[in-house]
Amino acid sequence: MPRVKRGVTARARHKKVLDQAKGYRGRRKNVYRIAKQAVMKAGQYAYRDRRQRKRQFRALWIARINAAARELGLTYSTFMNGLKKAAVEVDRKVLADLAVFDKPAFAALAEQARAKLAA
């Protein structure tokens, strides 16, 4: 069986990791052993934060809807309950957008919710 020299594959592997570590500070960008750990940790953070981003946006939307609803004399929970009773199927992302950029439309939805809560 012939001898296998793995210099080419090792260089390619090192280059790949060091390219991924471009922009890091200190030895994390140019020392393979340290860069490899930094790239692995970055991947873990990226994986975790792709999931956290969804939670954080939902929390932001809820905070915006709550603030706008309170300006109109409703709490978030009563506002959402009223919308559900009024059969208004608008998601939180759109509601938050309306609360920030189209206050009259949000106020109209709040009135619909208030009417269904009173009935």
Curated annotation (Swiss-Prot):
Which PROSITE patterns would you find in this protein's record? Answer: RIBOSOMAL_L20
Q: Which UniProt keywords apply?
A: Ribonucleoprotein, Ribosomal protein, RNA-binding, rRNA-binding
- Provide GO CC annotations from the record: ribonucleoprotein complex; ribosome
Q: Write down the Pfam families for this protein, in alphabetical order.
A: Ribosomal_L20 (PF00453)
Q: Name one GO molecular function term.
A: rRNA binding
Which terms does the UniProt entry file under GO BP? ribosomal large subunit assembly; translation
Family listed: Belongs to the bacterial ribosomal protein bL20 family.
Q: What does this protein do?
A: Binds directly to 23S ribosomal RNA and is necessary for the in vitro assembly process of the 50S ribosomal subunit. It is not involved in the protein synthesizing functions of that subunit.
How is this protein named in the record? Large ribosomal subunit protein bL20
> Organism source for this protein?
Azoarcus sp. (strain BH72)
Question: What gene name does this entry carry?
Answer: rplT
